């Protein structure tokens, strides 16, 4: 695959962002390298869609060199974790080394309201703010996406709740 677009967290469940981005890019005819943490039914589904699936670890430099090599654009997203900042810096360093030309970072809405003198009590929000600062300093061409609400996961969970509610309401 020539110059695939890398999507980290492609099998993730946080708003199904990685999976949705992968699907949309593939529908546009783009070559996609979908990074996952492990092989499972979600990675098989990505492969069935046409993505090049690679197993990687955001905290492992060797792993990230293998995952990022040959990609000029990447969508970076990961689940909430104490290692979020370390993973972001690790990935940014490897992306810079490989000459990534566009780094799209999935951040959080609250980051836009923070500064060096005004932060929040939330450790996750602070990690996202610090990660954005590190990406800005990295020299990479970065775009920060700060969603307010993820409805994709809600839709999946809500549909099963609605089916149960309808079943109960109909006396079934």
Give, region by region, the residue ranges found by the protein language model.
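Hydrophobic acceptor-binding patch used for acceptor engagement in glycosyltransferases
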Residues: 74
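Short, conserved active-site loop motifs that form the nucleotide-linked donor/cofactor pocket
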Residues: 50-52, 142
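Cofactor-binding loops of NAD(P)H-dependent oxidoreductases
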Residues: 56
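Oxidoreductase cofactor-interface core, primarily capturing Rossmann-like NAD(P)-dependent enzymes
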Residues: 1-45, 59-62, 66-71, 80-83, ...
